[in-house]
Amino acid sequence: MPVCGCLSVVLSHAVVLLMLVLHSASGHPQTFPCRLIQRVALCSGRQLSVIPDCLPHETEEIFFDRNLLENLQDGLSRYPFLRMFSCANNQLMTVAETAFIESHLLENLNLANNELHHGHKQVAQAFRSLTQLKTLDLSGNGLSEDMVSVLVANLSSLESLYLSRNGMQRLDESTFRDLHQLKELNVERNLLFEISGAFDHMKKLQRLNLAFNCLPCLVNFEMTQLLVLNASHNSIEWFITNQNLTETFQLETLDLSDNHLLFFPFLPTNNQIRTLLLSNNRVGFYQHLANSTSSNWTTSVDYYNLGQNISNITMDLWNENLHGNLSSVEFLDLSENKVNYFPQGFIKQMPQLYWLKLRSNCLQSFSLTSEDLPVTIYELDVSRNRLTEIKASQTSKNKLNNLTHLNLSTNDLQNFPPMIFTSLPNLNTLDLSHNTVDVCYSSNYMGLSGCVEWSSMASLKQLYLADCSIQNVPSSAFKGTSLTHLELSNNPNLHLKQQSLKGLANTLQHLGIGNTGLQDFDFSPYTNLKSLNISRNSLSKLPDSLMALNLKLLDLRDNSLTTIKSEHASLLAKKLQTVYMNGNAFNCCHLDWFRTFGENKGIHVADLSEITCLDLNYRRHKVVLTDAVYCGFTNNNKESVVWYILLFVTVSVSIMGISVIYMLTFKPRMLPRVIKKKCWRPTSY
């Protein structure tokens, strides 16, 4: 009995202790698997396979991306105030029909990058409860057009729908038949080759993205309410709007870049297009072909609607007056096309044009006059053409007051009117690189062919003259300018004198004189210089004047430097942010500068992995892998001698041992005879 009594007492105490432990545990705050910020639960990337059931009842937003959810059951029913649920990048294949039955307020649903093609019909049943849904993202789910049609069949409240990276091929009027409120639709990166009538009933659609598909043409376009159309990266050869519509098209941005356009698009007669992107096509103008007398020459093309046999269109191929209204265009990008001329007055049809990009075409001449360019032009890029001539008149250039950026690089320009740029009062940036340009001497520039006058251009800040075959820069060349960037690299015969940059000491911030044969130049006056390129100049040592500058970027590539003085390295390491040094002949035994740069975390050696050095045997090694062994006897001289002695003794003993073994093995009688001859002596007894 005493034993039983003691046992009962012990058990009672244990029960009391257990209750205390449980009570204390319940007093601690519960640990959530998500991070909570007000009414937002951040549960992304937590390796979760179910929706947490311990979140606050009033949670409005749940981010559940990058988890392991495969089947969405009733986990959201605990959160009736939910307005946004993001479940992208999971493994979701099915959604229970009752998954959203309590989510009456849900407006934004993101299910991108899952596997919903497995159970799309069940998912569609679940969507029936989402009567307030405004935004839906089903991108990257392997959906066909039929699956999409089922999924969105009852989502009449949708305003934004994202279906990129799926497997849709053909869209028609039934695909989105119930989406009358849709304002934005993204179907990029599918396999679409036909979209006939798919969007005609969407009277509120404003943004349509068709990029990265296989569309062959867009004909009889009449979506007047659309603001932005992106049809880039397709196979479009024709873009033709319905010319019979009198209603004004609201389209502001049209992107047809990276297609197969042969002709300038046939735009609406009444439109508000501001941005027109046509780069990387095959656009050209063909007025010269209109008068061809060949019997087989076609002058018109007919388009037929094979589906309904109505709305047939006939267009004159060579009529250059069918471009529609261009009066509102502000940005025109025709880069990388086949344009070799512009029809008379074509660019002047755009009186609001600010940006004109004509890079990589076939233009041979260009007119820099207000008769051919709108006075609003702000940036003009005619680089990488075949220009041999720039037309200008002294009276008209003064009217291009808004022109600020001009790029004429990589052409075949040789002859310039000397004062061609001085009358552009607001020209800020000019690039003439990769042409044949000379700098005029103020005293006789009028007699030179191809030279350009730069002095007194107060607005000019950035001037690029790389690879222009310049040989001399006179002392008065940049007088009256306030250049901050001057690029003269790749003029190997340039004779740059100290007075050549006279007047730029207080303004110059970037100077490029790589591959100019530079030898002696005093950089100390240019106290505001931040970036300097002196690469490919065969420099054997750094100019001392560099140490007076507060440089942030220095390019020393492809010179003849063998080392950098310790004091120079210390100064540069404190000031520089980025340095390029590859292509020099650094000595592997004089790399103190390398260690100095490595110890200073503020400097970034951009090409560190490529820098090499030469050892005593002229073998090349990566600087980052260099060992002192390449320098011969240095501080470890005594230790190296000991190793050589030990090696010699070891070899000698080995040879002697081998000799003895040979004698004992092959001539055993010779050894006793030799020993007897050498060692035996007559005794006295």
UniProtKB/Swiss-Prot annotation:
GO molecular function: growth factor binding; receptor ligand inhibitor activity
One GO cellular component term noted in the UniProt record for this chain: endoplasmic reticulum membrane
Pfam families associated with the record: LRR_5, LRR_8
Top-rank taxon, per record: Eukaryota
Bilayer topology term: Single-pass type I membrane protein
LRRCT domain boundaries: 597-635
Extracellular side: 28-640
Record Gene3D superfamilies: Ribonuclease Inhibitor
GO biological process terms, semicolon-separated: immune response; inflammatory response; microglia development; sequestering of TGFbeta in extracellular matrix
Residues that carry a glycan: N154, N230, N244, N291, N296, N309, N312, N325, N402, N407, N533
LRR repeat residue intervals: 57-79, 80-102, 103-129, 130-154, 155-178, 180-201, 202-225, 248-271, 273-296, 326-349, 351-373, 374-397, 400-423, 425-447, 457-480, 482-503, 505-526, 527-549, 551-571, 573-596
PROSITE patterns with a match to the protein in the record: LRR
Record carries keyword Transmembrane: yes
Signal peptide: 1-27
UniProt keywords, alphabetically: Cell membrane, Disulfide bond, Endoplasmic reticulum, Glycoprotein, Growth factor binding, Leucine-rich repeat, Membrane, Repeat, Signal, Transmembrane, Transmembrane helix
Cytoplasmic compartment residues: 662-685
Family, similarity comment: Belongs to the LRRC32/LRRC33 family.
PANTHER family: LEUCINE-RICH REPEAT AND IMMUNOGLOBULIN-LIKE DOMAIN-CONTAINING NOGO RECEPTOR-INTERACTING PROTEIN 2 (PTHR24373:SF38), SLIT RELATED LEUCINE-RICH REPEAT NEURONAL PROTEIN (PTHR24373)
This protein's name: Transforming growth factor beta activator LRRC33
